[in-house]
C-alpha cells in the first residue's frame, strides 16, 4: 500500500520512545496513523544488541553530522537514527521527572521558566506509560523519586554482582546510587 493511497488521521514524525508511544495509543483508539522514521530497522544480529557496538563505536550515529554546543563549538550527537530512535542506546531506563523539575530554574545563562503543568498533572500519564512498558522497580529505592499513586506492577530485577560492588563503594562515599 502506497502512502498516498490512504487517508491518515495522524502523521507522527519519529519512531523513538515518544513517537512510537503516541502512534501506539492513537492506533488503539482506531485512528489511522502514519509513522515516519528517518532511519531503518536494525537487523537482528549480535552487534545490534551490544551496547559497545551501538554506543561507543557509534555504529548507527549520524556520520559527519555535528551539533553546536552552548559555546558554539561543534560536537557529534549521541543519537541513533533507526526505528526505535534512542531507545536503542538508552538502557531501558524510564525515570520520572522530579517535582522540582517542573519549577522555574535559575541557570548561569538565565532563567528556565516553569512548565505550564505540574508533576501531579503528569502523574497519571507516568502510570500509563510504566504499565505499557512493563517498567520494573520498587518505590523508595531512589531517595529522590517523587510520590506515586501506585506501586510498580513489576518488581526490580536483581542487581548484578559487579554493580552491587560499585553501589557499595558509592554508598561508602556518601552517594545515593540506585538501580
Segments (PLM) and residue ranges:
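Conserved redox-cofactor binding core of oxidoreductases
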Residues: 106-179
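N-terminal glycine-rich phosphate/pyrophosphate-binding loop and immediately adjacent elements
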Residues: 2-120, 124-127
Amino acid at each position: 500500500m502506497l502512502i498516498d493511497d490512504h487517508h491518515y488521521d495522524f502523521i507522527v514524525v519519529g519512531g523513538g520512545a515518544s513517537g512510537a508511544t503516541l502512534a501506539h495509543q492513537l492506533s488503539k483508539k482506531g485512528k489511522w496513523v502514519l509513522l515516519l522514521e528517518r532511519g531503518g530497522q536494525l537487523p537482528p544480529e549480535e552487534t545490534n544488541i551490544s551496547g559497545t557496538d551501538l554506543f561507543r563505536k557509534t555504529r548507527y550515529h549520524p556520520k559527519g553530522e555535528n551539533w553546536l554546543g552552548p559555546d558554539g563549538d561543534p560536537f557529534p550527537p549521541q543519537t541513533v537514527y533507526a526505528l526505535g530512535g534512542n531507545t536503542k542506546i538508552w538502557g531501558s531506563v524510564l525515570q520520572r521527572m522530579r517535582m522540582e523539575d517542573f519549577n522555574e530554574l535559575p541557570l548561569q545563562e538565565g532563567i528556565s521558566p516553569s512548565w505550564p503543568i505540574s508533576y501531579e498533572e503528569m502523574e497519571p500519564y507516568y502510570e500509563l506509560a510504566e504499565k505499557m512498558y512493563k517498567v520494573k522497580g520498587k518505590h523508595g529505592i531512589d531517595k529522590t523519586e517523587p510520590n506515586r499513586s501506585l506501586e510498580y506492577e513489576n518488581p526490580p530485577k536483581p542487581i548484578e554482582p559487579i554493580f552491587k560492588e560499585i553501589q557499595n563503594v558509592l554508598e561508602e562515599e556518601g552517594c545515593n546510587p540506585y538501580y
